[in-house]
Regions:
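Active-site- and interface-proximal helix/loop "cap" or "latch" segments in soluble metabolic
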Residues: 18-122
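A glycine-rich dinucleotide-binding beta-alpha-beta segment and adjacent secondary-structure elements
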Residues: 285, 465-547
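Glycine-rich loop(s) and the adjacent beta-strand/alpha-helix scaffold that form part
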Residues: 300-302, 308-372, 563
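An anion/pyrophosphate-binding glycine-rich loop and adjacent beta-alpha core
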Residues: 351-355, 360-461
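N-terminal Rossmann-like FAD-binding beta1-loop-alpha1 element of flavoenzymes
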Residues: 130-160, 569
């Protein structure tokens, strides 16, 4: 990509003297290793100041990296210092930008030690700002943005508070998989399905611990939610498949990598309806009046906000997988040693705020591990044409099993890890997250070999065991049955080249949270509605029970986010 971001200043910046010579005037380019590939910058200086910084080339993940690519150059130019904060959630990209700019300034003869010193400017006192709107939404992930758009569609004025420097939450980092029964399209692809089947698998897959009425709302409205997204130009692939832990092929895969398509569609819709989004603004407290939630206090970079809601507040700030203290409170063995796939903002802030106003919690002890970690990279996150083998080269589990059962089995294997084995039939140029397979191979994340003998040697497993595992799987494909009880079958693993990706479990989804009713109103400990208070998305509990099916999280965010926004807008 060329000239993605450019930042410049006019005249001398604060704290610099026009006569003080600091650099050799000119334009300088430099590179640094980014998250996905080298990142290239151009820095222009005059004798005394940094004038302009351009990001010339990068292959960073859209949405997740945008704030780092934009805000760090801007901050360096404005403050004339390299001592700027990295962007939470995009640390690798942030550091790459800083390193590249540092190298360019070295070329310009800059005193790097001096440039790394913090500005001596006194901290600016934050201004107290009071605002009023119809609906306040806390969190700009899939649920929050869905709520904001749905409320705005009803004519409500909406303000969204997002503590991170970018929208997206966990949605933008997801695999983009959306479960919805679409009988007509599924039947055309030879798939028999029904809403009843989706309900049964979701409810029983959650060990019958979910609230049946909420499960019913999810499965009955997921297709409508998908069509709603499509009305804002969201694109899905034609083929319906299944992802790990989905139990059935009803997964609609987003055409854009990861969750980028969802957030692009919702941002477009929010802009259309003039939704106000305040980034880098953390909600800190719910404002109460006679038992009703009437607003939110929040802290931004420059302002302290007190925002009043004429109608309601929707809490959609996500789960708590990135909060080690909170998750170990409910599941002690999920310590800091257990990595998470979640973004760093998933710290349960909204749950804490909700508790303080009397909200009831449900299912906090149900925390799901994802069996597909290592940043979700690899040729695929689908299971239709994959087998899992341990470090002895043996299959050990039904790959289309529930995620909790998969993780239980994986953690019993050597090092708590396994290899996902694929052949050439399902390896595209990029996977569901937009990663180029060639780049993943170059990084060593994915191992590639022309035959199984070479693949076994590449990953250090016994050749005879790997070949036997693949051979037995291929026979099972013909019979549509195997000893592990697998139910999803597609093609054999027989056409080279072959691929192996090392994976392990990581904390992925917190099923517990604020207790809600069918209208997404938050309930107190006596089961009564807390007036003016709604919630949607991973911050809520009671939908997925003790285990969430793969592909059910995104419809959860869209369906319940939309319901919350509509009902909040209808408040008198």
């Amino acid at each position: 990509m060329l000239l993605i971001f450019s930042f410049s200043i006019l005249g001398c910046s604060k704290g610099t003297s026009g006569s003080e010579k600091k650099f050799k005037a000119g334009k300088y380019t430099a590179e640094a290793k980014g998250h996905n590939a080298p990142l290239k910058v151009e820095v222009e200086v005059d004798d005394s100041s940094i004038k302009e910084i351009k990001i010339l080339e990068h292959k960073e993940t859209p949405g997740i990296s945008d704030a780092a690519l934009k805000d760090i150059p801007k901050g360096i130019v404005e403050a004339q210092t390299l001592a700027v904060d990295t962007i939470s959630g995009a640390t690798i990209t942030s550091n790459a930008v800083i390193v590249a700019i540092t190298e360019a300034l070295k070329q310009a003869g800059g005193n790097i030690d001096e440039l790394k010193k913090k500005s001596k400017d006194e901290d600016v006192k934050k201004e107290q700002v009071t605002k009023e709107t119809d609906v306040i939404v806390v969190g700009a992930g899939g649920a929050g943005m869905s709520a904001a758009v749905a409320a705005a569609e009803k004519g409500a004025k909406v303000i969204v508070l997002e503590k991170m420097p970018m929208i997206g939450g966990n949605t933008i980092r997801s695999g983009g998989a959306y479960n919805a029964v679409d009988v007509e399209r599924q039947k055309a692809q030879g798939i028999e399905d029904s809403i009843d089947k989706h309900y049964t698998q979701t409810y029983e897959g959650g060990d019958k611990k979910g609230e049946s009425k909420l499960v019913k709302i999810l499965v009955e409205n997921s297709l409508e939610g998908k069509k709603w997204l499509e009305s804002y130009d969201m694109k899905f692939n034609d083929k319906i498949g299944s992802v790990v832990g989905s139990l059935w092929p009803r997964t609609h895969q987003a055409s854009d990598p990861a969750g980028i398509g969802y957030m692009n569609a919702l941002k477009k819709a929010a802009d259309k309806h003039k939704v106000e989004i305040l980034l880098n603004t953390k909600a800190t407290e719910l404002i109460m009046n006679n038992g009703k939630v009437v607003g939110v206090k929040a802290e931004g970079e420059k302002n302290l906000y007190e925002i009043k809601s004429k109608k309601a507040v929707v809490m959609a700030s996500g789960g708590f997988a990135a909060n080690v203290e909170m998750r170990t409170k409910y599941v002690p063995n999920l310590t800091k040693d257990m990595k998470t796939t979640n973004h760093p903002g998933a710290t349960g802030d909204g749950i804490v705020m909700g508790e303080k106003v009397g909200a009831d919690l449900v299912g906090m002890e149900y925390i799901q591990l994802l069996p597909m970690a290592i940043e979700l990279t690899g040729p695929t996150i689908n299971v239709e044409n994959s087998i899992f083998i341990n470090k002895e080269g043996n299959r050990f589990i039904n790959e289309d099993n529930r995620r909790d059962k998969l993780c239980e089995a994986i953690l019993k294997q050597k090092d708590g890890q396994y290899y996902m084995i694929n052949d050439s039939q399902i390896v595209k140029e990029t996977n569901e997250l937009g990663d180029k397979i060639s780049e993943l191979i170059e990084k060593g994340v994915v191992k590639k070999a022309d035959n199984l003998d070479e693949l076994a040697k590449a990953i250090g497993v016994p050749v005879e065991n790997l070949k036997k595992s693949v051979e037995e799987f291929n026979k099972a494909v013909d019979k549509k049955s195997d000893a592990f009880g697998r139910g999803v079958w597609k093609n054999k693993i027989e056409k080279g080249p072959f691929y192996a990706t090392l994976r392990y479990p990581a904390v992925h989804h917190t099923m517990g949270g604020l207790k809600i009713n069918e209208k997404t109103q938050v309930l107190d400990k006596s089961g009564k509605v807390i007036p003016g208070f709604y919630a949607a998305g991973e911050i809520t509990g009671g939908i997925h029970g003790g285990n969430r099916l793969g592909g059910n999280a995104l419809p959860d965010t869209i369906v319940f986010g939309k319901i919350a926004g509509e009902n909040a807008a209808n408040e008198k």
